[in-house]
């Protein structure tokens, strides 16, 4: 089936799809205090979703493109679930978040199909994949339209990979007790086996969101990147997130000696946000298999155990947490009790001495991840490194931090 036909098949105009903001029915929603963070964007008044400009621009989206799509959503007079929230238009039609971002992605997909130059075509496919992922954001379980956008994002990503430098392999890993999981191994030019970073992404992102990380930071240093969707989303959607948050990544890590392109004696893990929960667990449970673990804005204890901090987090992020935990109609109290069990300190891991070198980067006044969180990680390691990342200028400092983290990982893998 051609890309165009697939798009038409998946996105038939219908108006009965459940609107994203209604998928999680928590009982006592509160008011949203203003909040901004480098990794998550900010909760802009009159938007259900957090507007994550830094990460979208970092992934290659032009700021003007973001504003154009937002403008189309704002200007729509179609029926909304909540008249006060622009991005709650009901049904797949003009003004609906998924519709507008997918429409933008389809324009780039069409350009990719028409482009004769393979490299340029690959760039267009990659851009289409990024936009489809934004369409599906924040990837709540049961969001049919978002799942269709994710399918298109993955297809576009595969098309891009065939045309861009290096090589990409789609790999399937068996996991006892359930469905196998699909991972993407990104390999730089040259002969393997390669030192490899196992990417542990955030709960509101897909594994295909990290190509920029590979291309700009790992590939130039000859490092491969292996990505895997977090439990309950994407290719790992049949797995529920549990307190054993590292289960899927752990099975993949154990299988690496059987992957000929990976030097399984030189593997590190890198965790963004809740992905750090996975990475730090691996540092304790699989120390002999890991040379290093790096974290950025980690969510390993404070947000999971502190009701006060949870009350400052935007509704969308709490919905993401509830969705991943399979608690679609839970009260905030029930959600808090469950989240506490995911704290690595409560689990008895963090605070104990860990032989794996661990680095953690943080931003001052980060509502999701205070400085103490990163300090707890680095002081638990026998070889810890703490990095404070200045907020402004946000893009330049983010790039500088990633360069420093990659150099640290590279040094540990050598």
UniProtKB/Swiss-Prot annotation:
E.C. number(s) listed in UniProt: 3.1.1.1
Record Gene3D superfamilies: alpha/beta hydrolase
Gene Ontology MF annotations: carboxylesterase activity; hydrolase activity
Keywords from the named record: Hydrolase, Serine esterase
Catalytic activity: a carboxylic ester + H2O = an alcohol + a carboxylate + H(+)
UniProt cross-references to InterPro entries, sorted A to Z: AB_hydrolase_fold (IPR029058), FrsA (IPR043423), FrsA-like (IPR010520), FrsA_esterase (IPR050261)
SUPFAM superfamilies (UniProt xref): alpha/beta-Hydrolases (SSF53474)
Role, per record: Catalyzes the hydrolysis of esters.
Similarity comment: Belongs to the FrsA family.
This protein's name: Esterase FrsA
Naturally occurring in which organism (per UniProt): Salmonella typhimurium (strain LT2 / SGSC1412 / ATCC 700720)
